[in-house]
């Protein structure tokens, strides 16, 4: 059977896909056919994804118009402080499209004012309930009653954007700083957009990262959900501040040349009915699958039916909304694995290609993800999309027309698991260097990946950050700069080495969760009944990194230098990594990338004098040393020391380097010239 030439290119790159070519072809056809059906062959996806400009509350031609989709409803009232929160026929919506279930009301301008609260009272056969509009752009919670309502946001002086988005030329690689606005503050409280802009954004800029990934932006009723139980998909989280304050945050980041991407939660929705979409019109199936498939048992949330026209309209419009309204520069799609598989991939190892091409795959979800990427890149060609998938689904970060699903990047989610296993289960002297190298570089070459040693996942309560796994409770008593405890020294050394080799072998991007760059202690535990609603573990102790008398600043300084070198030498823009030396017993790895030489000695106590390995001919200068005293090391190498390759007999054309490799350390060398030391040396 012949396939589309572009699909054939994918099959040629990965022969294992050949047995499933007919499924790939069918999925690709489904994407094209769904796009044709949604756009009716006339308007493009960019127009189709403008549902947020039709539904919801809008000021149009001197008055207000509100529309909602509720096909099972038989009566809907707009209620709020403008009508004493009572049903009033003056505020009754009328059904304007019986077949589609679209409702509308038009009101004079004077009816509604800035910051008015409102909601819907929806009646359906056999029942009724209050609901927050599905397209509400601002939702607030009353501090006393804890009740959520939609709020009209129409200030007299709306926010005016001051700075352009970063240029497309800066997109060749990503250094991502993952952050949560609410827990970004030092004080034990919920932080705000304004505080983040003033206090945290400058730290990110100084640290050298070029992209901020903001978590928990979509409105969510329960703060402790980390933002993953979304109720109002078009509303920015109000507990952090106003829409204008979020825009100012994004604008300030753009002024500094930073991209801002956000976590986009389209994998599920909160099960709350009043605040969320569940049983919005009295049915369980309006937005979600009916029956057990519509409920995520592990997350206690609702699962979207990606095969429904109006669900696609809602979610695709949501993608466009955040680009248009808040000028976000892209998205990290959360929970993609849960979307892809009917069983959500729970408890599966994904050891065979058959796992990606059987009846357990939700092909409607694949179609949605492909169309979402098409919408995003149509609205903003330079936008960044990242897939969080732990299953390894082939093609997620491949072009749609080549049988992929259009993401720009995918997370290398096996890397943090690798580090946890090695630290937790294997003594240092038995670390499998060959396996380490394989896993760090195990990725589909045609798909861009983002690596990380740890993210927010590893910092949550019940888990441990890398630094805490390495040092443990000694962090509380032995992090003074002059303290010389062996366990602490080991932890600091490995923390730097782990992060350096993860970045140096990353595909096209690197991610760090806020605070991990300086070894922030302890896990994250949001306020909850079990901890007395305390914020003590839902904050960042920046003062630890600012204190010169503590060791934390060594890690922060090292990370800043490491990120700076990666940016200066465009490390992640050069995907090729060339292995020069791998030795299991010596615990040595040496490799070249972007003209830089990376040398690692993971041996816990054995230093290697006069250690030789082949390298590109030239003169090399050390530009980063994990063992430098300025980074809390022992200073066993000479700063800025230069080394020349030489060609020992019998082959004068086979240059080698001879280096001193201190134990449990790593360094980076820049090739400053192609000039070698020509005099032959004795072996």
Regions found by a protein language model. Give the residues of each.
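Catalytic cores of secreted or luminal carbohydrate-active enzymes
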Residues: 541, 548-569
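C-terminal beta-strand-rich structural cap/linker in extracellular carbohydrate-active enzymes
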Residues: 114-118, 640-683
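Substrate-binding/active-site clefts of carbohydrate-active enzymes
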Residues: 140, 158, 162-174, 180-361, ...
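Conserved, mostly hydrophobic/aromatic
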Residues: 68, 120, 179, 204, ...
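Surface-exposed beta-strand/loop patches in extracellular or lumenal glycoproteins
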Residues: 66-70, 76-80, 603-619
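Conserved alpha/beta catalytic core and glycan-binding cleft of carbohydrate-active enzymes
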Residues: 144-148, 327-329, 347-538, 567-612, ...
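C-terminal accessory region downstream of the catalytic core in glycan-modifying enzymes
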Residues: 562, 613-644
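The feature marks proteins involved in alpha-glucan
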Residues: 1-61, 65, 86-88, 92-178, ...
């Amino acid at each position: 059977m012949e396939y589309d030439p572009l699909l054939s290119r994918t099959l040629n790159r990965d022969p294992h896909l050949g047995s499933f070519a007919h499924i790939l072809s069918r999925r690709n056809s489904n994407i094209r056919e769904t796009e044709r059906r949604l756009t009716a062959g006339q308007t493009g996806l960019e127009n189709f994804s403008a549902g947020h400009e039709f539904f919801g509350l809008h000021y149009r031609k001197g008055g207000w118009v509100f529309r909602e989709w509720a096909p099972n409803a038989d009566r809907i009232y707009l209620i709020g402080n403008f009508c004493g929160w009572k049903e009033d026929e003056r505020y009754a919506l009328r059904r304007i499209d019986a077949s589609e279930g679209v409702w509308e009301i038009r009101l004079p301008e004077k009816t509604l004012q800035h910051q008015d609260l409102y909601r819907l009272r929806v009646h359906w056969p056999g029942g009724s309930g209050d609901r927050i509009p599905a397209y509400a752009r601002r939702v607030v919670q009353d501090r006393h009653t804890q009740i959520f309502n939609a709020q009209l946001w129409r200030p007299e002086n709306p926010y005016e954007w001051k700075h352009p988005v970063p240029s497309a030329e800066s997109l060749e690689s990503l250094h991502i700083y993952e952050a949560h606005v609410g827990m970004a503050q030092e004080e034990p409280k919920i932080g705000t957009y304004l505080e983040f802009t003033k206090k945290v954004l400058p730290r990110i800029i100084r640290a050298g990262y070029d992209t901020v990934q903001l978590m928990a932006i979509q409105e969510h009723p329960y703060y402790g959900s980390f933002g993953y139980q979304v109720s109002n998909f078009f509303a920015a989280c109000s507990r952090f501040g106003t829409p204008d304050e979020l825009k100012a945050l994004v604008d300030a980041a753009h002024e500094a040349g930073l991209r801002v991407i956000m976590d986009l939660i389209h994998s599920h929705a909160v099960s709350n009915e009043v605040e969320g979409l569940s049983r919005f019109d009295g049915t369980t199936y309006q937005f979600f699958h009916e029956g057990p498939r519509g409920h995520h048992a592990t997350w206690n949330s609702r699962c979207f039916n990606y095969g429904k026209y109006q669900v696609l309209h809602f979610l695709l419009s949501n993608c466009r909304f955040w680009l248009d309204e808040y000028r976000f520069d892209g998205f990290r799609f959360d929970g993609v694995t849960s979307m892809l598989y009917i069983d959500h991939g729970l408890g599966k190892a994904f050891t065979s290609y058959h796992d990606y091409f059987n009846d357990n795959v939700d092909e409607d979800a694949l179609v949605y993800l492909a169309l979402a990427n098409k919408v995003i890149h149509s609205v903003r060609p330079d936008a960044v999309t990242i897939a969080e998938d732990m299953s390894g689904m082939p093609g997620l970060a491949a072009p749609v027309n080549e049988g992929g699903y259009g993401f720009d990047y995918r997370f290398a989610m096996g890397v943090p698991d690798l580090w946890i296993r090695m630290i937790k289960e294997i003594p240092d002297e038995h670390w499998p260097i060959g396996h380490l190298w394989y896993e760090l570089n195990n990725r589909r070459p045609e798909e861009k990946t983002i690596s990380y040693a740890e993210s927010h996942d590893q910092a949550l309560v019940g888990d441990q950050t890398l630094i805490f796994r390495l040092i443990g409770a000694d962090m509380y008593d032995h992090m003074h700069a002059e303290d010389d405890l062996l366990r602490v020294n080991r932890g600091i050394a490995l923390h730097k080495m782990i992060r350096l080799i993860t970045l140096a072998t990353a595909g096209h991007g690197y991610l760090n969760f806020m605070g991990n760059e300086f070894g922030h202690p302890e896990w994250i535990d949001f306020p909850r009944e079990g901890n007395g609603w305390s914020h003590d573990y839902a904050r960042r102790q920046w003062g630890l990194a600012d204190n010169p008398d503590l060791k934390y600043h060594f890690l922060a300084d090292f990370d800043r230098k490491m990120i700076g070198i990666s940016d200066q030498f465009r490390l992640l823009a050069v995907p090729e990594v060339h292995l020069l030396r791998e030795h299991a017993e010596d615990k040595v790895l040496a490799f070249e990338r972007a003209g830089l030489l990376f040398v690692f000695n993971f041996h816990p106590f054995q230093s290697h004098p006069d250690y030789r390995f082949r390298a590109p001919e030239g003169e090399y200068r050390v530009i980063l040393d994990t063992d430098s005293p300025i980074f809390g090391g022992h200073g066993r190498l000479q700063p800025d020391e230069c080394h020349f390759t030489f060609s020992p007999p019998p082959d004068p054309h086979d240059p080698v380097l001879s280096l001193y490799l201190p134990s449990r350390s790593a360094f980076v060398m820049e090739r400053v010239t192609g000039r070698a030391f020509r005099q032959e040396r004795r072996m």
